[in-house]
Amino acid sequence: AGAMEGIFSMEKWRSIAAGMSCLSMLFATGAVTASASDEITEIPEQSIVYWSMWEEDEPQADVIREAAEAYEEATGISVEIQWKGRGIRSLIEPALDAGEQIDLFDDDYQRMAQEHRDYLAELKGMADTVDYKKHIMPVLLEQVKNWGNGELLAMPYQPYITGVWYNKDLWEEAGLTEQDIPDTWEKLIRVCRKIKNSDSGLSAMTCDEEYVNLLYGYQLARYLGQEKVQQLIRNCTWSQIPQAKEAADDIRILFFAGYMSQSAPAQHPEGQDEVGDGEAVMVLQGSWVPNEVTEATGSDDSWGFFPWPAVKSGTDGTEGVMVGAQGFGVTKDSQMKQEAFDFAYSICTGETDMKMTDAVNSIPADTDNTQWPEVLADAVPYMKEMSKPYMWAAGLEADPDYKEQIQSELLKLTRLEETSDEFIENLSNMK
């Protein structure tokens, strides 16, 4: 019973208690007869249909399954889970358009509020009854409401911070110390050169194909600031902004000069796994990467972190950090909105949130849970010092209709199939 209380506070079930109270009143007034009460017990079991962004064999799924069992035990309402994996981003809208019954789903919280918004219910009323804003990182609440034009359309969970994650053992093997941790682009290049010239045989950096936008997005935002990156994309002024080419030159040099692994950009997750396999020292990724790499490679090396460095004469420095989360959303046509919200809330807060943190070494979503996993310890001070939250790819994906074209050109740039001039020219001609 104690464990159940930890997961489900009375406050969370206020709506259920209210429903039971109304039912008691109906019995008291004779509005429901004894025979009718017999029929009530025969009503078919209610259920919430939840489409999940996780695969059923992932550790997140284990935590969610346990939460679903606890929810059903507490309420009598089952949670029917369909494990869709990351492909949910393209599967969910056609399914809802076809009239499929889905009450709850999850995806990246920015994508939830921006791309899936027309399918989502506003959650503020339900959130206020449980004082939800007390449990959520202010920066995440501000971001998700901003994307929702003031509406709360998604409940962030499993927050992340994005920056350069490095294998501390390999860092030392290449002759580097804590004093070498770079805060400027020039110092990062110096570190890369030092690793390349060492006897270690290590690649300085690595990356996967789907994350090359992080490299260019961060570098461009360092020069311009995130807002101007979004303006550049909206107005398609690539050829008029010299920093756009400068950032492309910078990222291309990482590959051209041999600072990136020869296999980069690799097919995910082969690139990031090189850090665990003892082949590459650094990778620009989200805070899920230490856990993913450890699980995939069996490495027990320790991890360090630093923000993407500042550029000379740039607008933003290391105070600009890409942060985000996954997000639960309740569908606007659901007949089980309150129940779906209650179930999602039970995962985002309290004991289940800590179980998720422990299972995948992620940042706690509930601000009451203050203990970060040891593997992410180096990122804690930077999260606290962050004053400019960046969205995913620092604004490079601000226009959903345009992001695939940018990604395609970035792959050509990083595969050295085109020059920086050609990169800018091709992007200039795309709108």
PLM features: residue spans?
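A structural signal for short loop-to-beta-strand junctions that line the ligand-binding cleft
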Residues: 103, 130-171, 203, 315-320, ...
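C-terminal capping/gating helix-and-loop segments adjacent to ligand/active sites or protein-protein/ligand interfaces
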Residues: 147, 322, 360-370, 374-431
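Extracytoplasmic/periplasmic substrate-recognition and gating elements
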Residues: 46, 69-74, 78, 97, ...
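Hinge/lid segment of periplasmic solute-binding proteins
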Residues: 39-42, 108-163, 189, 304-306
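Extracytoplasmic "Venus flytrap"/periplasmic binding protein-like
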Residues: 70-139, 173-175, 180, 274, ...
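Short, solvent-exposed loop/beta-turn-alpha elements that line the ligand-binding surface or hinge
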Residues: 124-139, 181, 205, 223-246, ...
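Glycine-centered hinge/linker elements that transmit conformational signals in sensory
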Residues: 190-194, 233-264
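Extracytoplasmic/periplasmic solute-binding protein
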Residues: 149-157, 162, 172, 187-236
